[in-house]
Amino acid sequence: MLDKIKWLHVEPSSRCNAHCPGCARNNQGFGTADNLIINDLNLERLETVVSKSPKLEHVIFCGNMGDPCASKMINQQLDIIFKRQNLSLQLHTNGSLRTEEWWSQLAKKFESRLEVWFAIDGLKDIHSFYRQGTNWDKIINNAKSFINSGGRALWQFIPFAHNEHQIKDCIKLSQNMGFAGFKFIKDARYSNNSYHYRTGKDLGIKPWSKQNETWIRKNNAYLNNIQDQKIVKTKIKKTDCVHMIFP
């Protein structure tokens, strides 16, 4: 089977600094799930899979149960991919981990072989309502450091009722910062319940108003009427929550 693999989805860690209500690693935001096992992907296991996949072209560092950058072995995990010069890497993160210098060095190291998706669900006053436990200023500074060092970054946005009024402003900011694209999540992790990660108070997070509207496929891009607004020059595509649909 490994000899046929061309792209590989990797979960580097089950650790995370965030407490997003829709994530399976916690109880709708308040406390971690009882069955959650905290660990990092074994380096030997990753090395074995990569080395035995001769047709492998693309690797995705993502996380259903954690953030890749929270891994205690992320540098070594990245090195395993880096030393295979034919591999490209897509890294998904909330962006609120590591230092600006770390992000700068990452961009310089991988150059065009790396694309980072920063999960930013609004401006400073709104973002952390869902992305609990993250720091918007730190995310923006890390993204700037990565982009300014030559890195290719995409702004990933989950639309909710509480942040949809900021979509246009987020698109503008992404363009001003030099993001290469703005990504909407197709099937967001909406849940019936959402709680504050410290108090357990009900947050009442709801889907956005256009959640049930039909999206139109055109030239391999999924577009809705937001694409028609003149301020949008960045191609907007939608993808599923584990990013299994690619441009």
Question: Where do the model's predicted regions map?
Answer:
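Alpha-helical scaffolding within the catalytic cores
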Residues: 98-106
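SEC14/CRAL-TRIO lipid-binding/transfer domains and related phosphoinositide-recognition modules
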Residues: 1, 7-8, 12-13, 36-52, ...
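A short, conserved beta-strand element in the Rossmann-like catalytic core
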Residues: 21, 68-69
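Buried hydrophobic side chains on well-structured beta-strands
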Residues: 59-61, 67, 91, 118, ...
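Short beta->alpha connector loops
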Residues: 94-98, 161-163
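N-terminal pre-triad scaffold of radical SAM enzymes
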Residues: 1-26, 57-63, 242-247
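Radical SAM enzyme [4Fe-4S]-AdoMet core and its adjacent flexible, acidic
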Residues: 11, 26, 31-41, 51-52, ...
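Acidic donor-diphosphate engagement hotspot in glycosyltransferases and nucleotidyltransferases
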Residues: 73-74, 102
